Amino acid sequence: MAERGSSAPTAAAISLCVLLAPAIAQAGSGPLGIDHRWNYDNSGIWKRSNQDLVRYGALAADIGLALWAGDGTRLGRSAWQSVDSVVLAGVTAEAAKRAFGRERPGDSNDPNQWFKSGERSFPSGEVAEISAIITPYVLEYRQDHPAVWGLELLPAYDAIARMKVQAHWQSDVLAGFALGTASGIWAQQRGTPVILSVLPHGFAVGFKHGF
């Protein structure tokens, strides 16, 4: 198992900031002073259907890998930690959305509209989920397989895409990334996957060993 250094959260944050800096580096409003509405663009790689492909594709691949590999290998353990991570991030993001009630840029040009009934812009649940999925893998393999950092491109893409379709403000996607990364760090450092501990033993063995 890779050494768990305290530098991992910092490195993850730096990597996303580098990727998103050109996109968010503009004066605006909101809690960080960077929120501003982008011109609507639902075309090309930014199409909503492509966003869904990344989101649900990553989730399906993650769950499929966990079920197939079980908990007996390094990769399988990381997959189950990732499942824990995405569940925690998804539940927390949904609770925060309901609590903060922030209007989306598609509904208002004012990023300071909070606590509105039915509004759920903050934080970005999709960025949180994708970040939560990849973080355990990045933490586990970052030292012996540095290319794993390339997975950070997935939440970076989704963050930009969500802003382009006016679904989120800049601070929404940054908060989503922070939430997902924190969930992933918790799941990976905990060691034993929570969800796996309440499932029948066959899930820990994995389908590849069960047939």
Language-model features, listed with the residues they occupy:
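Outer-membrane beta-barrel architecture
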Residues: A132, P136, A182, G206-K208
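Outer-membrane beta-barrel proteins
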Residues: L67-G70, Y141, I185, Q189-V194, ...
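Bacterial N-terminal signal peptides that target proteins for export
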Residues: A2-A13, S49-L53
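Alpha-helical transmembrane segments that form the membrane-embedded catalytic/substrate-binding core
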Residues: E126-I130, H168-Q188
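N-terminal signal peptide c-region/cleavage motif recognized by signal peptidases
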Residues: L20-I24
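Outer-membrane beta-barrel "beta-signal"
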Residues: P200-F211
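Membrane-embedded beta-strand positions of outer-membrane beta-barrel proteins
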Residues: A96, V194-V198
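Hydrophobic alpha-helical bundle signature of multipass membrane enzymes
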Residues: Q26-P123, V127-M163
